[in-house]
Amino acid sequence: YRDVRFSKDKSPYKTDAAAWFYHRDAWHAVCTAAVHGGAGFYFQIAPKENIVAGGIWMPPGEALKTLRLAIANNHEELRAILKAPAFRRAFGALSDEAVLKRAPVGFDPEHPAVDLLRYKSFTVSQDLTEAELLSPKLPDICAKKDATMLPLVRWLNRLLGLPPHSRRLRRAGAAGRR
């Protein structure tokens, strides 16, 4: 909320609507400094900026350290996800909005995965056209894009100790609560 009664600039504080879908086991950790909310999916509608995105954006220090250590030890798995033909067609590469210029502290600048270790966020996104946004098939369009991101999201969550979600787990959990 932005009080604009006495302001010359009457533009609203926020001009977009967004939704973040994160791991079911991470709900208690969202927006806390000590713990991360895990990787997930993001949907945004804004003037001239409608996107579907996924991954983990600016994780706290401990989560970022965990991810970097895992990448340093097994970067081939992440590279395989990023080089998958469907993934490359849809997203190209990881977003480069938050990348260090040099290797992070504690990592060898000559490490074969230094290009991946420099990332501070592990996200991908794709713009939605106005036709897609206004289409009655928008949920299907987003689901298809999210399915393409799913290997990255699952890989990140697995490294952070969040197991993959499945219908079987959901049914078993619901049955146990009755």
Language model: regions and residue ranges:
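Context-gated lysine
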Residues: K8-K10, K14, K48, K65, ...
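Aromatic- and glycine-enriched beta-alpha-beta binding-site module
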Residues: R2-N73
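Compact, glycine/acidic-enriched structural inserts
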Residues: I45-F107
